[in-house]
């Protein structure tokens, strides 16, 4: 199983909320991604991987977005199961069960979109994981999606469990995962809830990142 501990005293740049926004909201996703990239360049950390936020319809309704959005996960915020993950007492510390993929090869930009079959063929390992979500925005989870994108997809940290070999394509929708804190179930997930299956969410993320890089 996966486990983590959240303790206080983390540096402000990694978790402290802004008291005010730096300006008007980005007018569109493209500008929000550009702001996300600028923040990524200034933080001085190493980009390790990407998350795909709001893949569930329930989450999309809660955050008033019509689809998922990517966010960076830094090497400094990527942990193995059992690690101590530092947070501030003011952080939301929202924990969500996730499925993570490591890739055996890159998916370069091309004219036609990558198919689900092609994306799965590039997967090396599949991991149960826990994402710690923490908006740094003054309004928290009550802002426009462009600010969520700019705020690194609201990611604070990702905790990875042991990896397994890729599954059969039809099995990803059946994956179950849950988060318990101090023995109490906090949240549970089913693969089919993530855009119809975690393999579809993975393909969506790949397409988003390729489009953003164009």
Label each residue range with its predicted role.
Residues 198-214:
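A conserved acidic, glycine/proline-rich C-terminal tail/linker
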């Amino acid at each position: 199983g996966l486990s983590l501990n959240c303790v206080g005293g983390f540096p402000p740049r990694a978790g402290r909320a802004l008291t005010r926004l730096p300006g008007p909201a980005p007018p569109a996703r493209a500008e929000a991604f550009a702001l996300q990239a600028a923040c990524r360049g200034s933080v001085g950390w190493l980009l390790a991987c990407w998350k795909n936020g709001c893949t569930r319809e329930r989450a999309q309704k809660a955050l008033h977005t019509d689809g998922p959005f990517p966010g960076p996960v830094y090497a400094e915020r990527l942990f193995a199961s059992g690690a101590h993950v530092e947070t501030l007492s003011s952080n939301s510390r929202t924990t969500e069960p996730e499925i993570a993929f490591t890739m055996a090869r890159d998916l370069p930009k091309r004219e036609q979109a990558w198919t689900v079959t092609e994306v799965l063929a590039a997967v090396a390992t599949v991991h149960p994981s826990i994402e710690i979500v923490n908006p740094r925005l003054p309004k928290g989870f009550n802002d426009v999606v462009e600010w969520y994108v700019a705020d690194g997809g609201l990611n604070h940290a990702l905790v990875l469990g042991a990896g397994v070999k890729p599954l059969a394509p039809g099995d990803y929708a059946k994956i179950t995962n849950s988060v318990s804190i101090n023995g109490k179930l906090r949240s549970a997930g089913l693969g089919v809830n993530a855009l119809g299956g975690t393999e579809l969410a993975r393909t969506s993320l790949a397409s988003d990142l390729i489009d953003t890089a164009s």
